[in-house]
Design a protein with these regions (language model features):
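Short, solvent-exposed loop/turn segments at conserved positions within beta-propeller repeat blades
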Residues: 119-123, 173-177, 218-221
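Acidic, small-residue rich beta-repeat scaffolds with periodic aromatic anchors
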Residues: 21-107, 207-300
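A short beta-strand motif characteristic of beta-propeller blades
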Residues: 87-91, 136-142, 190-193
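Beta-propeller blade repeat segments, especially FG-GAP/WD-type strand-to-loop junctions
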Residues: 128-134, 174-193, 225-230
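Beta-propeller blade termini
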Residues: 99-106, 146-155, 198-211
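Acidic/hydrophobic-patterned starts of short beta strands in beta-sheet-rich repeat architectures
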Residues: 108-115, 156-167, 208-212
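Bacterial N-terminal signal peptides that target proteins for export
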Residues: 1-8
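Bacterial N-terminal signal peptides
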Residues: 9-18
Length: 300
């Protein structure tokens, strides 16, 4: 009997061990199978990221190559007088790539400047070069803009012409006419490389002032007034609708304020019965006034 029991135990034990091992291995198989979709997703993500990076790198290299070739064209074609030319680059990997060059004596230093517009996928890159007798100086390396317009005039009233680029972002919640201002200081009489950016400005060079509309929703965004001090801007004031009167009157502040978030700031301002006359010529005033009484349905 004891011998039979021992024999049964010897036979039964391997069966139990095999069963246990089989049971223990199944979760590992399931786990391995469950990891496959995650690994595939990670692989696809890595491939997409690598593809995007490679595409961006290729575009960047092509853009720089195009700019260098445009500058070589300037050197080859420029004969010491005004010159305009443009061309489209045929490239199977690029939907659209074009170059426009304009060369004139734009500023008061009597030097010739080449403004090079490189358009890639609808984004325009603007570069300005000063053309000397023995050298070419890169004065402006502009950002990429979406369908920009540029102009040259004396923006700060110092008697010298400045270079301005106006653009509009592809996406925004609110009015956003963006200006990049490249000044030409009176002492140098040539365009400088740094710039000042402003949103929704209107320029008053004879007064050495800028009046404009801040970025934000009507009713909560303000008007601003800046004064030029050489190549610098000083903040003078901000005008906001008074939420306590549902926007029928206004409040003048010396700092930019957010009455919706900081209601106590209302007490710091000067109450105005009406909008000051000087602001009625601001180009984006319609956006500032685009509010109704319902805008201020919060208790103040």
């Amino acid at each position: 009997m004891n011998h039979l029991s021992s024999l049964i135990r010897l036979v039964f034990l391997p069966i139990v061990l095999v069963a246990c091992n089989s049971t223990a291995e199944k979760p590992q198989e399931n786990k391995s199978q469950g990891d496959k979709p995650k690994e595939l997703q990670k692989s696809k993500k890595d491939t997409l990221e690598r593809s995007y990076f490679e595409e961006q790198l290729a575009d960047s290299l092509l853009l720089e190559k195009t700019k260098k070739e445009a500058l070589l064209e300037v050197v080859k074609r420029f004969k010491g007088e005004d010159l305009d030319f443009s061309y489209v680059i045929e490239d199977s990997d690029t939907s659209y790539l074009a170059v426009t060059v304009q060369i004139k004596k734009y500023f008061e230093d009597e030097a010739y400047y080449a403004i090079i517009y490189t358009n890639m996928y609808g984004w325009e890159h603007i570069d300005i070069y000063k053309l000397g007798n023995q050298s070419i100086e890169h004065k402006v390396a502009g950002k990429h803009y979406h369908f920009p317009t540029d102009t040259i005039f004396d923006v700060n009233g110092d008697g010298t012409k400045d270079f301005l680029v106006k653009s509009y972002p592809l996406s925004s919640c609110c009015r956003a006419n963006i200006y990049d201002i490249y000044l030409s200081p009176a002492a140098k009489k040539e365009v400088v490389t740094s710039y000042i950016d402003l949103v929704n400005p209107t320029f008053y060079p004879q007064e050495k002032l800028i009046r404009g509309v801040e970025y934000g929703h009507p009713g909560w965004t303000g008007l601003y007034k800046y004064r030029w001090r050489g190549e610098h801007l000083d903040t003078l004031e901000y005008i906001y609708p008074d939420p306590t009167t549902k926007g029928r009157t206004f409040i003048k502040m010396h700092t930019s304020s957010d009455f919706f978030l900081k209601r106590n700031n209302i007490r710091k301002g000067t109450r105005l019965p009406s909008l000051p006359e000087e602001y009625k010529t601001v180009e984006d005033l319609d956006w500032f006034l685009l509010y109704g009484e319902g805008t201020f349905d919060t208790n103040f």
